[in-house]
C-alpha cells in the first residue's frame, strides 16, 4: 500500500510546491485505501488582479474533483499541465486508485487530458457546505468525510482485476528500479500483454507512460530538492542508461530540459 504519511508530505507532481496557495493532503478515509490514494484540498484568496500559475506534472491517475461550480472526473494526463488561479476559491479532490476509476468510466483512455462533468448534486452540496465553514481545518476534515462517505456508497470493493491493477500501481510507484514493462509483468506474474490491458483499462495510459511518469516526478523532485546532484547522477539513480535518455523523456512530457527546470527554480522554490 503506497498511501502513507510520508507520501502525503512529499512534493511529487507539483513542479513549484512553494508557490502553491494553502494546500493540504488528507489521508484516504478509513477503509477506502483501495479506492482513494489521498485527498487534496487547496484554498486560495489572491489580491485583485493577481494570477498564480500552478504547474503540475500529474500522477498517472485520474481525480474526482469537487469545486464551487460542480463535480468532475479529471482523466489521466499525458503531459504537464497548469492552472491559473485568481480571486478566491477552493477544490476538494480525490486521487483515485485504478480500481476506483474502473467504476467511474469504462474506458479512461477516452478522457485523457480531459474532464467529465458528473451529475452528483448531493455530493457537491455536502462538500460546498463543509468548505464554507468559518474554521478552515474543520471544514477540510468535514469535506473529506463527505467525499469519503460518497465513495463508500458509490464505489464497490475492488474486483480481482482491480486489485491487481492497484498492485501494479503500488509496484511502479514504490520501486524505482522498475524501468521496463517486462519487469512489471515478471513481478506480477502475468504477461506483458496482461500489464498493457490492466494499464489501459484501469488507468487509461500505456504502462511505459505510467513508469516514466513516476520516474520523471522523482527526477523533478530530486533536481529541486538536491541542487548538488548532477542530472547524470539523478538519471543513474532512476535507472536511465544515461542522462540523455532522462533529458529526452523530460522534454517530451514537460516541454523543457532538466537543466532548464533547475535554472527556473528560485531560492524560494527550494526546501
Regions found by a protein language model. Give the residues of each.
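DNA major-groove recognition helix of helix-turn-helix
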Residues: 199, 211, 249-251, 262
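Positions that flank functional sites
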Residues: 215, 250, 266
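A generic alpha-helix surface/boundary motif
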Residues: 193-194, 214
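Amphipathic alpha-helical "recognition" segments
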Residues: 208-213, 217-219
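Alpha-helical bundle regulatory/interaction domains
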Residues: 1-192, 202-206, 221-225, 230-241, ...
Amino acid at each position: 500500500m503506497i498511501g502513507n504519511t510520508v507520501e502525503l508530505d512529499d512534493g511529487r507532481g507539483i513542479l513549484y510546491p512553494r508557490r502553491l496557495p494553502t494546500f493540504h493532503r488528507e489521508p484516504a478515509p478509513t477503509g477506502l485505501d483501495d479506492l482513494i490514494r489521498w485527498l487534496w484540498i487547496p484554498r486560495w484568496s489572491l489580491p485583485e488582479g493577481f494570477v498564480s500559475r500552478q504547474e503540475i506534472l500529474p500522477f498517472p491517475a485520474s481525480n474526482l474533483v469537487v469545486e464551487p461550480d460542480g463535480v468532475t472526473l479529471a482523466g489521466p494526463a499525458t503531459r504537464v499541465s497548469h492552472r491559473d488561479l485568481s480571486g478566491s476559491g477552493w477544490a476538494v479532490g480525490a486521487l483515485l486508485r485504478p480500481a476506483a476509476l474502473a467504476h467511474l468510466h469504462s474506458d479512461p483512455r477516452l478522457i485523457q487530458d480531459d474532464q467529465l462533468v458528473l451529475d452528483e448534486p448531493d455530493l457537491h452540496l455536502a462538500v460546498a457546505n463543509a468548505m464554507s465553514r468559518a474554521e478552515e481545518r474543520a471544514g477540510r476534515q468535514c469535506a473529506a468525510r463527505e467525499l469519503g462517505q460518497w465513495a463508500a456508497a458509490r464505489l464497490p470493493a475492488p474486483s480481482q482485476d482491480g486489485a491487481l491493477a492497484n498492485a501494479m500501481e503500488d509496484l511502479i510507484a514504490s520501486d524505482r528500479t522498475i524501468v521496463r514493462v517486462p519487469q512489471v509483468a515478471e513481478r506480477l506474474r502475468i504477461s506483458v500483454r496482461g500489464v498493457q490491458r490492466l494499464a489501459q483499462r484501469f488507468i487509461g495510459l500505456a504502462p511505459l507512460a505510467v513508469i516514466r511518469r513516476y520516474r520523471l516526478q522523482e527526477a523533478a523532485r530530486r533536481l529541486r530538492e538536491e541542487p548538488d546532484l548532477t542530472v547524470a547522477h539523478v538519471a543513474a539513480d532512476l535507472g536511465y542508461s544515461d542522462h540523455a535518455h532522462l533529458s529526452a523523456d523530460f522534454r517530451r512530457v514537460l516541454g523543457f530540459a532538466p537543466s532548464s527546470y533547475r535554472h527556473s527554480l528560485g531560492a524560494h522554490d527550494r526546501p
